[in-house]
Regions:
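C-terminal capping alpha-helices of c-type cytochrome domains
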Residues: 9, 83-89, 96-121
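Sequence/structural segment immediately N-terminal to covalent heme-attachment motifs in c-type
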Residues: 29-52, 58, 81-87
């Protein structure tokens, strides 16, 4: 019998001060549609259209893309998610110069809509 161990990628943590960033947007159909469009076009290739980290480009990435439906992601602050989208890390690009603040908050708002039942903050 052989045993296999799977290396766990350390969780990506935003700096504590990111928690102080507050989402100025209120989720509504317009904000969610805008966030979904941005997410699908820019985040979907790696994170997947449903946010599970299983997009077509995910297989070759290290670290693997986050599952945005997971309790870990859904329990992060909005500010933490905004910071990660803004700053990026290898292999995820920074979107600081690609999207406006409002567009990044739209993506955060959309990520919240991906929560599995019972996993929302």
């Amino acid at each position: 019998m052989f045993s296999r161990s799977v290396a766990q990628t350390p969780k990506w943590m935003a700096p504590k001060e990111a928690d102080d960033l507050k989402n100025p947007l209120v989720a509504n159909s317009h904000i969610l549609a805008a966030g979904k469009a941005l997410y699908t076009a820019n985040c979907g290739p790696c994170h997947g259209d449903k946010g599970r980290g299983d997009g077509p480009a995910a297989a070759g990435l290290n670290p693997k893309p986050a599952d945005h439906t997971s309790a870990f992601v859904q329990n992060e602050s909005d500010g933490s998610l905004f910071w990660k989208i803004t700053e990026g890390r290898t292999p995820m690009p920074s979107y600081k110069k690609t999207f406006t603040d409002e567009q990044r908050w739209e993506i955060v708002t959309y990520i919240r809509s991906l929560a599995k039942p019972g996993k929302k903050k």
